[in-house]
Amino acid sequence: GMGVSGGEEGALHGPSLMPGGTREAYDALAPILKAVSAKAEGEACVDYMGPDGAGHYVKMVHNGIEYADMQMIADTYFVMKNVLGMTAEEMADTWEMWNKGELSSYLVEITARILRKADEMTGKPLVDVILDVAKQKGTGRWTSMSALALGVPAPTITEAVFARTMSSQKEERLVLSKRYRDLAFEGTEVDRPAVLEDLRQALYASKICAYAQGFNPVSYTHLRAHETLSDL
């Protein structure tokens, strides 16, 4: 099998491909896969992942890392909005600036674009009127389960899965929100530039941790030579 990543843009301009199976099959298909795949710095975004279901396993872990990445962005947004009192436009400007540095990535780029998007009916920032529920297809949960089965830590990924689970429990959250007063940040004096720099560095460090945690189960599985990735 083969993991495929890229979404709509990947379909139009080339995806990232993670093939698994026999080496002979990969070698036979490699010219075609490299031709249709995305390119980064002149290199095809495709490589042999290993035997059997290795390609799908790597794609699963890729999704788990993405779960963590999106949750870290959501946590950063929460602090920007509720602690620093930033508007959607101010946040968009900040994310755009961050995307020019070491945080440059697709998710950071589209975060800025999303924050600039206005709801056509109300004129309000779209992010303020959409349903605050994030569902999941299961790949993040499977990544956490695999890490637990292997005995390797993946706390950032796992907490991102739990955050989505809590997000989907809308009715329960509404009940609890009536029992607990909102955290009162009003009147709290903060050094916005300093806090934003702390947020940027914290987000960068957290990203590194999430990637390391994703590589953990992949590396550990590879070292267990008596098993193939499809056994997990």
List each language-model region with its residue ranges.
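A conserved active-site cap/scaffold subdomain adjacent to cofactor or substrate pockets
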Residues: 131-191, 195-203
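A glycine-rich phosphate-binding loop feature that marks nucleotide/adenosyl-phosphate handling sites
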Residues: 95-98, 160-166, 230
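Conserved small/polar residues in nucleotide/adenosyl-binding loops
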Residues: 221-228
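Rossmann-fold dinucleotide-binding core
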Residues: 1-92, 100-129, 167-191
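Short acidic alpha-helix initiation/capping motifs at coil-to-helix transition points
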Residues: 68-71, 134-141, 209
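Short, surface-exposed loop/turn motifs that are enriched in glycine and acidic residues
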Residues: 66, 200-208
